From Swiss-Prot:
Transmembrane spans: none
Keyword Ligase carried by entry: yes
Function: Involved in chlorophyll biosynthesis. Catalyzes the insertion of magnesium ion into protoporphyrin IX to yield Mg-protoporphyrin IX. The magnesium-chelatase is a complex of three subunits, CHLI, CHLD and CHLH. The reaction takes place in two steps, with an ATP-dependent activation followed by an ATP-dependent chelation step.
Gene Ontology cellular component annotations, sorted alphabetically: chloroplast
Protein name (record): Magnesium-chelatase subunit ChlD, chloroplastic
Residue ranges with Acidic residues bias: 417-443
Organism encoding this protein: Pisum sativum
């Protein structure tokens, strides 16, 4: 759905600036310069729809007030003035029409207007009518969804109607450091002390109900907070059971999430629970870039002038949203159309059923925006592009299909055959009944071809870029160990009941737990010596979280003629990783093995100076105790894990896989050197190493094997080590330190996102 309207402002802008504004409206609305209600929507439906909205004052309020500023008077860039990004603006209009659509996620690098579009959408949202005294923006027309206790507090006017008032549609942003109690709500200490009972204090979720809930950099949001947030949004209700509170309130805002994939991917599980996932990293023409810079400069110099230039487009979008919300109640989608969406999802390799559910809702919203009660072909195609395509697993089209010639045109028909065919068609049309006509109309509302072919490839190659963008930013499922929880160090994320002595007292949670009992405790204390009464049962401890770095342990074969090259490569790779690990808190350790045993040449460290000093001496030569080297790496990793500073551990083994020293000889050289001590066979040495590799997998560590064996005498045992440890394997016999560093960084990045 494009936005091709060229809008000539009715006010004069800077003489040197010629701007072309792209309308927010779909093509059926953009056939004329401005939205014409009576020409686009059926007249018999327009008047009652407007009247239905104006009864609560929303339409009148929208025309009288300008809602382009935040609560603090800050002017946000208008959405109608954003150049390009048509698909994202369409998605935002869909979300404004139906906040229950499932949320919108926008990915993009820096400077792609992600946040600008999210904030600019707030200006086109119509105001809402809420019940007076409601803490969660209760809808007077849906009393079954009111929060607990509102029935007792509600007030009535002289006519017996519930008292209401009009407010701006809420726009709530969740900060990255938000705590759980601020998000879902907690105890109101002041009111609890006054009343002597537990009083609920609403959180951000209550404030965002029926509005917009915006999360910037959702990929950096705490994992527990993001899971809690999406669970509440999926259920549509926030149930708080904590600190003596039992409270529930509705929570159905429109979720808008933005993130930069370069700063970390979003878990696939989270993206799957958001309906529309789009990328702002789309190619932009030179002319559009010039226009974007021009309008941004004009907004900085004179924002009021820009608002005036797009004022009419913004008002039209508000009216369109109000009307579309009413049409949405009557929009229907047929069973055949649902089958089409399911087939597209199956061909695209989409997992689960969320894609079809979201796509059906998006198609209905598109029809409502067009002022229709039925879903058409274009609605289905657009729904597939917005919802199913970003979730798809694209397969490459076979070469023989890519260069296939187009099918030959049908043979020409003579005039007599045409006349006979026309007569037969007329007879068939007369014999068709009403049911046949409905079936024919239904068939016309299905696309003639699928977006995905039977093999899962894209029929339209123009859509390949969008699918690739979606797959590039897609994260992996799983629970990350990039955060360490403790009770003594880190950032305070939530209170908890102490398990033993309290190391860090959560003063806020302790006061909240004690607040409801202050009145009773004062009455018991006749001497009245204290102002606040806190008992041991009120104590709450802080749960802290801190960023956990990864530990990379280089296990280097320092035996043989190529030992010096391996050690130099490991040294260079370690120094490169340390130079880049300041923000990620990664540590590096080097364990060379030679002679009869392995030694920790560089203990886990983030210091480049220490690494340079320790690595000045590079011991080489002797036997190859590979099993002892891997065992030492496991011991170092476990000790580092106990320190509480390491979340992920990766062992990088640079070896040819040839071992000639047993683990018994490495642990007890004197006993192994005795004349009567049996010498281990080659198979026994391999079994030892395989056993250690299995232990690496069981401890949760990751193994990367860089095979340096000559391919002419290769035994393939290094690859077997990686297979048993469920690790990665690279054959790099002549790799430099840069190549080793690159391979390690890629494996480490995959480990952190897993």
């Amino acid at each position: 759905m494009g936005f091709s309207l060229t809008h000539t402002p009715h006010t004069t802008a800077s003489p040197n600036l010629q701007l072309r504004f792209h309308s927010l409206l779909p093509p059926s609305f953009t056939s004329q310069p401005f939205l014409s209600l009576h020409s686009t929507f059926p007249p018999k439906r327009t008047v009652p729809k407007l009247r239905a909205q104006s009864e609560n004052g929303a339409v009148l309020q929208a025309s009288e007030e300008k809602l382009d500023a935040s609560n603090y008077g800050r002017q946000y860039f208008p959405l109608a003035a954003v150049i390009g990004q048509d698909a994202i603006k369409t998605a935002l209009l869909l979300g404004a029409t139906d906040p229950r659509i499932g949320g919108i996620a926008i990915s993009g690098r820096r400077g792609t207007a992600k946040t600008i579009m999210a904030r600019g959408m707030h200006a086109i949202l119509p105001p809402i009518e809420v019940v007076q005294g409601s803490i969660a923006n209760a809808d007077p027309s849906c009393p079954e969804e009111w929060e607990d206790g509102l029935y007792k507090r509600v007030e009535y006017d002289s006519d017996g109607n519930v008292k209401t008032h009009i407010i701006k549609s809420p726009f709530v942003q969740i900060p990255l450091g938000v705590t759980e109690d601020r998000l879902i709500g907690s105890v109101d200490v002041e009111e609890s002390v006054k009343t002597g009972t537990t009083v609920f204090q609403p959180g951000l979720l209550a404030e965002a109900h029926r509005g917009v809930l915006y999360v910037d950099e959702i990929n950096l949001l705490d994992e527990g907070i993001s899971n809690l947030l999406l669970n509440v949004l999926t259920e549509g209700v926030n149930i708080v059971e904590r600190e003596g509170i039992s409270f529930r309130h509705p929570c159905r805002p429109l979720l808008i999430a933005t993130y930069n994939p370069d700063e970390g991917s979003v878990r696939e599980h989270l993206l799957d629970r958001i309906a529309i996932n789009l990328s702002a990293d789309l190619p932009m023409s030179f002319e559009n870039r010039v226009e974007a810079v021009g309008i941004a400069t004009e907004f900085q110099d004179n924002c009021g002038q820009v608002f005036k230039m797009v004022d009419e487009d913004t008002d039209n979008a508000k009216t369109q949203i109000i009307l579309a919300r009413e049409y949405l109640k009557d929009v229907t989608i047929s069973k055949e159309q649902l089958k089409y969406l399911v087939i597209e999802a199956l061909r695209g390799g989409v997992q689960g059923h969320r894609a079809e559910l979201y796509a059906a809702r998006v198609a209905k919203c598109l029809a409502a925006l067009e002022g229709r009660e039925k879903v058409y072909v274009d609605d289905l195609k657009k729904a597939v592009e917005l919802v199913i395509l970003p979730r798809s697993i694209i397969t490459d089209t076979p070469p023989e299909q890519q260069n296939q010639p187009p099918p030959p045109p049908p043979p020409p028909q003579n005039q007599e055959s045409n006349e006979e065919q026309n007569e037969e068609e007329e007879q068939e049309e007369e014999e068709e009944d009403d049911n046949d006509e409905e079936n024919e109309q239904q068939q016309d509302q299905l696309p003639e071809e699928f977006i995905f072919d039977a093999e899962g490839g894209l029929v339209d190659e123009k859509l390949l870029f969008f699918a690739q963008q979606a797959q590039r930013r897609r994260g992996k499922a799983g629970r990350a160990k990039n955060v360490i929880f403790s009770e003594d160090r880190g950032r305070y994320i939530k209170p908890m009941l102490p398990k033993g002595p309290v190391k860090r007292l959560a003063v806020d949670a302790t006061l909240r737990a004690a607040a409801p009992y202050q009145k009773l405790r004062r009455e018991k204390d006749t001497e009245n010596r204290r102002k606040v009464y806190v008992e041991k049962t009120d104590m709450r401890a802080k749960r802290m979280a801190r960023k956990a770095g990864a530990l990379v342990i280089f296990v280097v074969d320092a035996s043989g003629s190529m030992a010096l090259n391996r050690m130099q490569n490991a040294k260079g790779a370690a120094l490169k990783l340390l130079a880049e690990s300041y923000t990620s808190r990664d540590q590096v350790s080097i364990i060379p093995f030679r002679g009869d045993s392995a030694e920790v040449l560089l203990p886990p460290s983030r210091s480049i100076a220490m690494a340079r000093k320790r690595l000045e001496r590079l011991p080489c030569g002797g036997g190859s105790p590979l099993a002892h080297g891997l065992t030492t790496a496991v011991r170092v990793g476990l000790n580092a894990e106990k320190s509480g500073d390491v979340g992920r551990i990766m062992i990088v083994a640079i070896t040819d896989g040839r071992a000639n020293i047993s683990l018994k000889r490495s642990n007890d050289p004197e006993a192994a050197a005795a004349s009567d001590a049996p010498k281990p066979t080659s198979q026994e040495l391999k079994d030892e190493i395989i056993e250690v590799a299995a232990k690496i997998y069981k401890t949760g560590m990751s193994l990367l094997v860089i095979d340096t064996e000559n391919k002419f005498v290769s035994t393939g045992f290094a690859k077997e080590i990686a297979r048993v440890a469920q690790g990665k394997y690279y054959y790099l016999p002549n790799a430099s330190d840069a190549v080793v560093s690159l391979a390690t960084r890629e494996a480490l990045a995959a480990l952190k996102s897993s």
